[in-house]
Amino acid sequence: FLRMVVRFLGGNNMSKGLKLSEILVTVLIAVVFAIIYNLWWFAYNVAQVAGVHIEQLTYGVWFMAAIVAYLIIPKPGIALIAEFAAGAGETIVMGKFDIPTIVYAILQGLACEIIFAIFKYKSRSLMVAILAGLATALISFPVDYYYGYLAEVAGWNLLLFIIFRSISGIVIACLLS
């Protein structure tokens, strides 16, 4: 597994892979987003009071670390490292280890990596960021289902849930990044 990760990040030739400075900048971005993610729970919970899944329109903030890091350092692995480190940092700031947060972070980072890989890590265009935000939103639904967050949501309500989170992934995660 470690050999696969080393190859993914550039093999033994570090000039092709990630430099230490790039990893450190990525982790710094992740730390900032770990704090933002924890503070954002307040806005999410306030929006939840409105009902009909309006809070999903704020959800895109949790997708931003990967996109911001990639826009600054467009290299393979950056989005995954940023999102994982932000998720891990979020659990540290929360004061408890939270497996679902780590699972979401890894899958969201991978969703962004897939989009960036499709464009061969060469494009920082608005469309690529939009696709990354949307992919990140879409990958979160199976995890929601697995953890039972969608079990009691009626069909029409689930549709709102999906539409609002997808909009948030596109608008908040992309445009604010």
What are the roles of these predicted feature ranges?
Residues 5-28, 35, 161-177:
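Alpha-helical transmembrane segments and their cytosolic interface
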Residues 15-69:
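Hydrophobic transmembrane alpha-helices
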Residues 20-29, 58, 62, 77-82, ...:
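Alpha-helical transmembrane segments of integral membrane proteins
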Residues 29-37, 65-66, 86, 90, ...:
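Alpha-helical transmembrane segments of multipass membrane proteins
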Residues 39, 92-93, 115-119, 123, ...:
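Helix-loop junctions at the membrane-solvent interface of multi-pass transporters
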Residues 45-47, 86-114, 144-147:
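Interfacial aromatic-anchored transmembrane helix boundaries in multi-pass membrane proteins
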Residues 51, 122-177:
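Membrane-embedded alpha-helical hairpins and interfacial helices in multi-pass inner-membrane proteins
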Residues 70-81, 118-127:
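Membrane-helix interface "capping/anchor" motifs
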